[in-house]
Amino acid sequence: MSKGVMYVDNIRVEYDNEPNVLEVCRKAGVEIPNFCFHSDLSVYGACRMCMVEEEGTGKIDAACTMPPKNELHIRTNTARLLKYRRMIIELLLSAHCRDCTTCEKNRACRLQEMAVRFGIHHVRFDDTREHVKICLLYTSDAADDLI
């Protein structure tokens, strides 16, 4: 970890020992949506919701796994990132029980909150839960054959 200056949505932010760009953004008061990051746990980077776009190169990367870099310029809210995040939420919803009224997390669900925040009222993708089960069964069977 180190010290330096980054630019988050044109806001100059000094960082000092923040382990990743997500924490630098939080320090700047810029909230980036995420599902899997928690500062007390090891970085996982699986949800991909915290993607940021590097100015100049257009490269996108997960802010939770990206170390801060001096003079780095990033964008957190481009049209490309919003489209990307909407698709991630839709994919998560496609593998999620859609009968929220019977779920104990109803109205206290981060996925519901994100869907509302990003204006998702309809999921374009088919229900993928059965496909995931089949894939897991196939993987388990293949693993059993190796033992």
Predicted regions located by residue number:
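Single conserved hydrophobic/aromatic residue that forms the stacking wall/gate
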Residues: 138-147
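Signature of N-terminal electron-transfer/Fe-S-associated modules in redox systems
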Residues: 1-134
